[in-house]
Amino acid sequence: MTDGLRWQEVFQGIDSTLLQEPKFVRNKEKLLQTFGGKTSKESREKLLPFLWNTIAPNGQIYGNRAKGNRMNVLNPYWFSYPGYNEVLTGFADDKINSNDKIWNENITFLETLNNNASFKDKVAAFATWEVIPYIINEKRTNIPVNAGLE
């Protein structure tokens, strides 16, 4: 799962609209040379090569709104912690309304899996955000979480 990416860049490559904004771009020509392409497919593969050359051929990429493939969260906040909770538990929780480091009271599918005898102590999480241990509730679940800063 990714977080903090705009669907436009994921599916269409470099955003020419943002290239016109001096507050976002220092060297437009270099960006176009490095990440541009004759097609959006070529541009997106230059911008996110691992996603398109490794993950996509072996998995599924959802959320291309230009093709009507809308993936929406149900929570009203549209930012990280509420979204991760929703994905990991299967439901939105309006009480989760910040990205603060608060132990998640909800049971995630990772915890359910870890409580299954076949998977006991075989579940772990790897992330790059220091709030993930709280979302998974590492303290309660005893699921090892490496959040990149540990």
Q: Where are the regions that the model predicts?
A:
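Active-site-proximal N-terminal segment of extracellular/periplasmic enzymes that hydrolyze or transfer
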Residues: 1-60
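Short, solvent-exposed loop/turn and secondary-structure capping segments
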Residues: 8-15, 66, 98-100, 135-139
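Phosphate-binding glycine-rich loops and adjacent basic patches that engage nucleotide phosphates
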Residues: 10-11, 67-78, 123
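Glycine-/proline-rich flexible loop or hinge segments
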Residues: 30-38, 69, 89-98
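N-terminal beta-rich core of secreted/periplasmic extracellular enzymes
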Residues: 57-71, 117-121
